[in-house]
């Protein structure tokens, strides 16, 4: 049964940070706040778990990762990918200026994960256990992913047999979501376009008169 799958299981020996957002899912710039969570997809071979990291400013998915187990690597891999992606784009994250917000799942409170956040200079923020509103933006993204990608044949022509099928569909959906899906909250532009406009405005301000 789908209802029997729990993604938020608190760790007995984890490191529990406070909630720095208090349900305020807005940001003044890119890489001010990342929200993250993972969801699950049923395949013929078993459950697949898909983790996303979303930049709150433009609601852009900066990284994602799929796995067949709910270990710390499920959330560690996209974190490393997100940091690398920003550096590759010429906008590296700055120590002490980025908040990473998640639920209280054992993956996010593990010593290994919290130590890596500290290494990157990222401030951890964790909502309360069992309260979806404390990570409402990611709950919305997970819902869109299920509705637009998993429960349709738009991004995959048939049932999901293995993790490879999930990865194929997810990659296509993320590309569409970031670059072509129009958001009313962003003025009917895509997350990538909204973010690009922000950096273009900064570049214009820096140009000599």
Whereabouts are the PLM-identified features?
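Charged DNA-binding/catalytic regions of mobile-element recombinases
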Residues: 1-209
